[in-house]
Each structure stands twice: as structure tokens, then as C-alpha cells.
Amino acid sequence: MMRRIYLLAAVVAAAAGLVFGVSAGSAGDQPTVISLLSVQQGGSLIDVDRSGGRGPTLGDEFIFTDGLYQWDGKKRGKRVGTTHGIATITSPTTAFFTGTTVLPDGLLQGAGYFRFTARVEKIIVLGGTGRYGNAGGEVTITKLGGENSNRSSFVVRLVP
């Protein structure tokens, strides 16, 4: 049961960081590519169907907060934002994630499905506010470390 919760937490942490550690698109036809590190700060599993602790079941939700950091692939840099999200269990092996990232120049919104056992996932950027008002694109999320790790790298690709 705890292994499944750790897997869910790792997937959600990855999603959160990914979707949201982004900067505004640049002028021209080239996408903006940003790499960040997402570190899970906390989370709670909500037993929506009151099944009594048998682990996550269909409809249960995992609510979380992640810190977002500059990252060059080796060393964590300064904190640049926070992601708040919800992952709803849709099957024994998947969840649907939605989240909002708070960055200095605005907010980003993202969503997508995650498989608990996948090491790499993709999620879409739906839009944002402020500097990110017309944001759209895709994020590639890669879990770092073992199954109990709370860290994920991600590459955000915003289309012009």
C-alpha cells in the first residue's frame, strides 16, 4: 500500500514540476525550452470513497505542493516557484493530474494522465496568466532516483 502511495507521490511531483517551471515564449518560430527540478514539499491522499486505507482506489485524490528550482541536470539552483496540484486516481495504474504553478511573472496551468510505473511522461501546458497568458506546449517529465524519490526533472517546451 505505501509503495503505491510513494509511486503516486513521485508521479505527481514530476508532473507538478514539469508543467509549471516555464518562462514565456520568445519571439520567432523557435520554442522556448526550460529545464527545472521539482521537489515534493508535501501532500495528502484523500480517501474519497472511504475504502479504509487499502491504498489509493478509483476516485481518490492526492493533493500536493512542490518547490521548483533552477537546474542544470546536476546541481539544484535557487527556488523559482511553487506548484499546487491534484491527481485523481482513474485506474489502479493511472491518475489524471491538474495543477497550477506560481512563478514571479504569472501562473501556468497544466494537465495530463500519468502511469504510476512510467519513468518518463508527457503533459500539456494549457495556458496561464501574466507573462504566460498565451502559453501552450508540452512538458517531458523524468523521475529521478528510486521509486521513493521526491524529485523529478522536466523539460518544458513552449510553442511560439
What are these regions (language model features)?
Residues 16-31:
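C-terminal region of N-terminal signal peptides and the immediate post-cleavage residues
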Residues 1-9:
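Bacterial N-terminal signal peptides that target proteins for export
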Residues 28-160:
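Beta-strand-enriched cores of mature, soluble protein domains
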